[in-house]
């Protein structure tokens, strides 16, 4: 009681983790687990009423699979036929993917009350561009995106190597 919490950090169980095996693991996810969080906007509003900012953990490496609520919008944004169920593969080097990643997946949740993201990339340092670390790029783009409304940017992440400190 009377502990001065200022940020609610919600690990990966905010999203579905027990998914059909045909979609892979539940490590990556963008659909709220309604058993644990039946009304996400209400929960986020309550945390804000308690004076807390909110960050959600995200492991984006597996892209967006067909079981996700946002899959049809993500597929459409990337020119994928949603009826086929082909995953929207994560690709930090693809401008169209990055735009959809923020516009389709993250911004709607921010409108519901998520203040910033905990980028928890653990899937290696390779992209289609040799030498370009996906975590470093994710931190860069999350930081830039967090400034779009004119405020000071903020990214919560794993250490991405030299230069990571430039993204608070």
Where are these regions (language model features)?
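Catalytic-domain carbohydrate-binding cleft regions of carbohydrate-active enzymes
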Residues: 1-168
């Amino acid at each position: 009681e009377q502990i001065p919490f200022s940020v609610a950090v919600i690990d990966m169980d905010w999203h579905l983790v027990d998914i059909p095996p045909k979609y892979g693991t539940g490590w990556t996810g963008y659909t709220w687990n309604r058993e644990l969080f039946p009304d996400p906007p209400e929960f986020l509003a309550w945390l804000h009423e308690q004076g807390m900012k909110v960050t959600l953990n995200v492991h984006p490496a597996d892209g967006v699979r067909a079981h996700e609520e946002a899959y049809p919008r993500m597929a459409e944004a990337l020119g994928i036929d949603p009826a086929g169920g082909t995953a929207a593969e994560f690709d930090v080097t693809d401008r169209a993917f990055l735009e959809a990643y923020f516009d389709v997946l993250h911004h709607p949740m921010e409108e519901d009350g998520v203040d910033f993201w905990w980028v928890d990339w653990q899937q290696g340092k390779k992209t289609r561009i040799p030498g370009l670390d996906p975590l470093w790029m994710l931190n860069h783009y999350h930081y830039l995106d967090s400034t779009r409304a004119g405020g000071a940017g903020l990214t919560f992440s794993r250490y991405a190597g030299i230069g990571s400190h430039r993204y608070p």
